[in-house]
Amino acid sequence: MTVIGTPFTDNATRVMLLGSGELGREVALELIRYGCEVIAVDRYAHAPAMQVAQHSHVINMLDGTALRAVVEQVKPALIVPEIEAIATDELVKLEAEGYTVVPTARAAQLTMNREGIRCLAAEELSLPTSPYRFADSLAGYQQAVREIGFPCVVKPVMSSSGKGQSTLKNEADILPAWEYAQSGGRAGKGRVIVEGFVDFDYEITLLTVRHKAGSEIKTSYCAPIGHRQENGDYQESWQPQPMSAAALQASREVALAITDALGGLGIFGVELFIKGDQVYFSEVSPRPHDTGLVTLISQTLSEFALHARAILGLPIPTIEQRGASASSVLLIQGQSEAMRYHGLNTALANADTEVRLFGKPDINGSRRLGVALAKADTIDAARDKANTAIAAFKVDL
């Protein structure tokens, strides 16, 4: 049975978030609701989760020595990675010493780069995927493109949110895509994956939760989430995504296989391509997923609430979906350390519409600063409402 201590005492249930962005902030809020003492860690100060957590630390999370130092200082009951760019080798050592890493240190290590998780999915579990090759040199990359053929997609093996990702349509795209991939990786220059283009009808995120049910571990699923990407970065998501019963069942089978292989407790964002009733595995995140922000309005328990319950060993008797819902992101380009947001009154004028501003401390380039959430009678109507809310915003930089 789960026992929660009292914050700011010796018996506090301390949970350390490694990564303190907008997803981490929602997780922190849910954990605090259950009485946890949250420690938010990131590479920069005043990150969104730091603004709500009881404590915060700024470190280079790719530095194993710095990571170990803050863990040994805090001695958390749970270490919860919220991003990929972490010294996962150190997490493996810490777990072996008795610390609990969510869902497991191995899951964090495998999903930190696309090579580990793709090899697990395609080669160990025999899940259907797009054809792929890995390369760590320009010559090897050019050979990989020749073998895969056009069109294809190139991504750094270590990146997220579409950074460094390109679609290649012909020979002229080869060199620019390589250079962009080398600049877009989270851990600097390095290895890339070249993937054959899947001719899919749509793509989904299937949020999959491994949680306690008595003495057993049970797997539960949220309704499928459809989403629209631009340059690998999510722009809109909606739930539920209409799909055939056969495709939904196949999606759940793929999600079950990959999450069982990763193990542990918590929510997983399983990304899948759907073509008719055929399902192709794309990626998995062992944590809440950005497209799952829609669940803040579409479910009685959001993906963040589900994650908090699961990692604390609490029951999840049911996952209730509340009907057609959508999210639309506030993506801004520019430079500023003091943004001002106009249009909130207009954005919230429609019924069943909500907004989350993430409170990010600065912008240098393109950055997601907020999200609009909407419910309606149909998916199209919900998307229109969410997009209308975002269109109301003007951000002064």
Curated annotation (Swiss-Prot):
Query: GO CC terms for this protein?
Result: cytosol
- What are the cysteine partners in each disulfide bond? none
Gene Ontology BP terms: 'de novo' IMP biosynthetic process
Query: Source organism's superkingdom?
Result: Bacteria
Q: Which reaction does it catalyse?
A: N(1)-(5-phospho-beta-D-ribosyl)glycinamide + formate + ATP = N(2)-formyl-N(1)-(5-phospho-beta-D-ribosyl)glycinamide + ADP + phosphate + H(+)
Coiled-coil residue windows: none
Q: Which InterPro entries does the record associate with it?
A: ATP-grasp, ATP-grasp_carboxylate-amine, ATP_grasp_subdomain_1, PreATP-grasp_dom_sf, PurT, PurT/PurK_preATP-grasp, PurT_C, Rudment_hybrid_motif
* Amino-acid positions noted as binding Mg(2+) in the UniProt annotation, renumbered to this chain: E271, E283
A single GO molecular function, which one?
phosphoribosylglycinamide formyltransferase 2 activity
This protein's pathway reads: Purine metabolism; IMP biosynthesis via de novo pathway; N(2)-formyl-N(1)-(5-phospho-D-ribosyl)glycinamide from N(1)-(5-phospho-D-ribosyl)glycinamide (formate route): step 1/1
Question: What protein family does this chain belong to?
Answer: Belongs to the PurK/PurT family.
Q: How does it assemble?
A: Homodimer.
Q: What does this protein do?
A: Involved in the de novo purine biosynthesis. Catalyzes the transfer of formate to 5-phospho-ribosyl-glycinamide (GAR), producing 5-phospho-ribosyl-N-formylglycinamide (FGAR). Formate is provided by PurU via hydrolysis of 10-formyl-tetrahydrofolate.
Q: Write the protein's name.
A: Formate-dependent phosphoribosylglycinamide formyltransferase
List the top taxonomic levels of the source. Bacteria, Pseudomonadati, Pseudomonadota, Gammaproteobacteria, Oceanospirillales
Q: Which gene encodes it?
A: purT
